[in-house]
């Protein structure tokens, strides 16, 4: 998912950087929007799958709920960091 996001951003950005004047500004905006949409969709799907697995694990073994919750929170933080990295890359493209 990260590779697809990076490929989409870089393929559109290279055309925009090679253009003269303001001809590529629209392409940079389009690339940033597509890149953030892909990252947000991937993170949403990943977080949903993680929450589903945590709920199933807690339902099967309620005594392990505390350990599962700690692991879930850590995993959700890692997944959310990918969206933040995509946002930083998109902001770098927009305010170059």
UniProtKB/Swiss-Prot annotation:
The chain crosses the membrane at residues 26-46, 68-88. It is found in: Cell inner membrane. Keywords: ATP synthesis, Cell inner membrane, Cell membrane, CF(0), Hydrogen ion transport, Ion transport, Lipid-binding, Membrane, Transmembrane, Transmembrane helix, Transport. Its main location: membrane. One of its GO terms (cellular component) is proton-transporting ATP synthase complex. Coiled coil: none annotated. It is a multi-pass membrane protein. It comes from the Bacteria. InterPro entries: ATP_synth_csu_bac/chlpt (IPR005953), ATP_synth_F0_csu (IPR000454), ATP_synth_F0_csu_DDCD_BS (IPR020537), ATP_synth_F0_csu_sf (IPR038662), ATPase_proteolipid_c-like_dom (IPR002379), F/V-ATP_Csub_sf (IPR035921). GO terms for molecular function: lipid binding; proton-transporting ATP synthase activity, rotational mechanism. PROSITE patterns: ATPASE_C. The record marks 80 as: Reversibly protonated during proton transport. HAMAP family: ATP_synth_c_bact. F(1)F(0) ATP synthase produces ATP from ADP in the presence of a proton or sodium gradient. F-type ATPases consist of two structural domains, F(1) containing the extramembraneous catalytic core and F(0) containing the membrane proton channel, linked together by a central stalk and a peripheral stalk. During catalysis, ATP synthesis in the catalytic domain of F(1) is coupled via a rotary mechanism of the central stalk subunits to proton translocation. Key component of the F(0) channel; it plays a direct role in translocation across the membrane. A homomeric c-ring of between 10-14 subunits forms the central stalk rotor element with the F(1) delta and epsilon subunits. F-type ATPases have 2 components, F(1) - the catalytic core - and F(0) - the membrane proton channel. F(1) has five subunits: alpha(3), beta(3), gamma(1), delta(1), epsilon(1). F(0) has three main subunits: a(1), b(2) and c(10-14). The alpha and beta chains form an alternating ring which encloses part of the gamma chain. F(1) is attached to F(0) by a central stalk formed by the gamma and epsilon chains, while a peripheral stalk is formed by the delta and b chains. NCBIfam families: ATP_synt_c. Belongs to the ATPase C chain family. This is ATP synthase subunit c.
